[in-house]
Design a protein with these regions (language model features):
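Acidic/polar active-site rim loop that often engages polyanionic ligands
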Residues: 62-75, 98-99
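Accessory alpha-helical/coil subdomains and C-terminal extensions
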Residues: 34-39, 45-49, 54, 79-183
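Conserved beta-strand scaffold positions in the cores of enzyme catalytic domains, especially
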Residues: 5-6, 59-61, 105, 129, ...
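Glycine-rich oxoanion-binding loops at beta->alpha junctions
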Residues: 1-37, 43, 75-84, 88
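C-terminal non-catalytic interaction/assembly regions of soluble proteins
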Residues: 176-235
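Short beta-strand elements at the ligand-binding edges of bilobed clamshell
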Residues: 70-82, 196-203
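Short, ordered loop/turn segments at secondary-structure junctions
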Residues: 10-11, 40-43, 62-68, 110, ...
Length: 235
């Protein structure tokens, strides 16, 4: 089951004292004594704001975002599944790129982080990977593509993180086609990366994070986030 059975939404009301009081009253009414939140920066900020107004509820955070960009953990729930969904899509694009002798520029999600692009690019054998963390030299990319074509390479795949300084897949493709004349196509994978059945690694990591979160609550911890750091589960 992809997505989230808990549902997810931004609530302007929750950002007010009245909204937080309503949330606290609902928790008391339903006999909820503690809160485990799953999400990214916005979720953590909301949880801390709630804790400052209602410290009587212990709160533990579990990192959940496909971007894998939460400080304090090497892994976030959703990342591995997103990478695998993107990789499967690029494998299919490789087939048609080869058949028609085209250059495909594929944009993946990740906001300002290039983790998805980097991992899926390596895993799928992309000719180039563009990520926000490193400078993008389009002239060098064009030169590499031209050399590859001279060597007889029929097609190419370039993976671009949506937050890269190049301006994303559309701008990158325009530059490549304009400078080389290559038949270039753009594919923006978009929100399909947020769906899909979780991978086995994902399920295992989520179960471990859940266990650690409950363990932290039983030890009396509050306002901490669980994570994995250098192979060790921490909070």
């Amino acid at each position: 089951h992809g997505g989230t059975i808990l549902f997810s939404a931004r609530s302007p009301e929750f950002q007010t004292e009245e909204g937080m009081k309503k949330a606290a009253d609902n928790m008391r009414y339903h006999g909820i004594e503690a809160l485990v939140v799953i999400g990214g920066d916005g979720t953590y900020k909301g949880a801390l704001d709630f804790a400052s107004h209602h410290p009587e509820f212990p709160i533990i955070g579990i990192p959940g975002t496909i971007d894998n960009d939460i400080y304090g953990t090497d892994y976030t729930i959703g990342y591995d599944t997103a990478v695998n969904v993107a990789m499967e899509a690029i494998d299919k694009l490789r087939d048609t790129a080869t058949s028609h002798g085209r250059c495909f520029v594929v944009e993946v999600m990740g906001r300002h982080a290039g983790y998805i692009a980097l991992e899926v690019g390596i895993a799928s054998g992309a000719e180039d990977i563009l990520i926000p963390e490193t400078p993008t030299d389009l002239d060098k990319i064009v030169e590499e593509l031209q050399l590859a074509k001279k060597r007889g390479k029929k097609s190419s795949i370039i993976v671009v993180a949506e937050g890269d300084e190049s301006g994303g897949a559309m701008e990158t493709a325009k530059s490549i086609e304009g400078k080389t004349g290559f038949d270039t196509r753009v594919t923006i994978l978009g929100h399909m990366q947020r769906g899909g059945s979780p991978t086995s690694r994902e399920r295992l990591m989520a179960a471990r994070f859940g266990y650690i979160a409950v363990k932290a609550l039983l030890e009396g911890k509050t306002n901490v986030a669980v994570g994995i750091w250098k192979g060790e589960y921490t909070y």
